[in-house]
């Protein structure tokens, strides 16, 4: 079955093409740390031959506590992204939380992301669609894979068909997430075989029911990423940090930066193997 291709500049994103890495840090903590992390990702992905898009948030607008670090904000965040693009020649993805942010962010970065908690907000979807930018839609934890077709339809109605879908797990009882591996194929089907990627980092979140910050299970990141990529996906969404224990957001889920090359070597081997197989139709 023909898979839809979404182009991010010269990077082609599709379920049957070599996977694209959307990787970086959870939130921009400083200009220097962003430069350090981006440089390491660029070095490793170039060595392994993996198409790469840098990711980070300029504002974490949905933190559990009002006292938690949110990021440098729109103006300073865009300056950092511009410097990363100029220095390393990378494409950049970041999330927007308000309709008024869509165009200013799209003027700087290459992919704008619709956060999971906001994925059904029509005004935000319409504003993002109007930019003409490539869109990454995070599947909400409370929405089934089949319902993602409705969100994609909103973007199409807004004149934008450059849509990527991203799964980050589903609520399983209280304060826990699980990843339904069967959901990836459902998301492909209801979106006209749009590219589907896997956010392995946020799928590892495990909240403290009485705390103000997310816990995580980064010790299982390799196993979960290998399982997801074995389905046959367009990309992997990954967050890393040189010192996860002291990261300002979601450190418990972040891959230690020093392990990146070893981790990606395994993921690429699985992706190469899976995409070497002929398509097998088991419905007929």
UniProtKB/Swiss-Prot annotation:
This is 2-dehydro-3-deoxyphosphooctonate aldolase. InterPro entries: Aldolase_TIM, DAHP1/KDSA, KDO8P_synthase. NCBIfam families: KDO8P_synth, PRK05198.1, PRK12457.1. PANTHER family: PHOSPHO-2-DEHYDRO-3-DEOXYHEPTONATE ALDOLASE (PTHR21057). It catalyses: D-arabinose 5-phosphate + phosphoenolpyruvate + H2O = 3-deoxy-alpha-D-manno-2-octulosonate-8-phosphate + phosphate. It is an enzyme of class 2 (transferase). It is found in: Cytoplasm. The keyword Lipid biosynthesis does not apply. One of its GO terms (cellular component) is cytosol. Pathway: Carbohydrate biosynthesis; 3-deoxy-D-manno-octulosonate biosynthesis; 3-deoxy-D-manno-octulosonate from D-ribulose 5-phosphate: step 2/3; Bacterial outer membrane biogenesis; lipopolysaccharide biosynthesis. Pfam families: DAHP_synth_1. Belongs to the KdsA family. GO terms for biological process: keto-3-deoxy-D-manno-octulosonic acid biosynthetic process. Keywords: Cytoplasm, Lipopolysaccharide biosynthesis, Transferase. Its EC number is 2.5.1.55. Its main location: cytoplasm. The lineage of its organism: Bacteria, Pseudomonadati, Pseudomonadota, Gammaproteobacteria, Enterobacterales. One of its GO terms (molecular function) is 3-deoxy-8-phosphooctulonate synthase activity.
């Amino acid at each position: 079955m023909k898979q839809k291709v979404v182009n991010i500049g010269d990077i082609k994103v599709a379920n049957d093409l070599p996977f694209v890495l959307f990787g970086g840090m959870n939130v921009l903590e400083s200009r220097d740390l962003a430069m350090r992390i981006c440089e390491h990702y660029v070095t490793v992905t170039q060595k392994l031959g993996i198409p790469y898009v840098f990711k980070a948030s300029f504002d974490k607008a949905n933190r559990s506590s009002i006292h938690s670090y949110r990021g440098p904000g729109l103006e300073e965040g865009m300056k950092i992204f511009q410097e990363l693009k100029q220095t390393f020649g990378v494409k950049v993805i970041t999330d927007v939380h308000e309709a008024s942010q869509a165009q200013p962010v799209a003027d700087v970065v290459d992919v704008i992301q619709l956060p999971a908690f906001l994925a059904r907000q029509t005004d935000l979807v319409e504003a993002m669609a109007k930019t003409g930018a490539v869109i990454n839609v995070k599947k909400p934890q409370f929405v089934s894979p089949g319902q993602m077709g409705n969100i994609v339809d909103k973007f199409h109605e807004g004149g934008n068909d450059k849509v990527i879908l991203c799964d980050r797990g589903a609520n399983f009882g209280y304060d826990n997430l699980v990843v339904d591996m069967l959901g990836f194929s459902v998301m492909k089907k209801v979106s006209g075989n749009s590219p589907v990627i896997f956010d392995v980092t946020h799928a590892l979140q495990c909240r403290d029911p009485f705390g103000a910050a997310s816990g995580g299970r980064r010790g299982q990141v390799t196993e979960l990423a290998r399982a997801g990529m074995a389905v046959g996906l367009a990309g992997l969404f990954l967050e890393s940090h040189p010192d996860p224990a002291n990261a300002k957001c979601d450190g418990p889920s972040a891959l230690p930066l020093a392990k990146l090359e070893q981790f990606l070597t395994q993921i690429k081997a699985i992706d190469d193997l899976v995409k070497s197989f002929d398509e097998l139709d088991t419905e007929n």
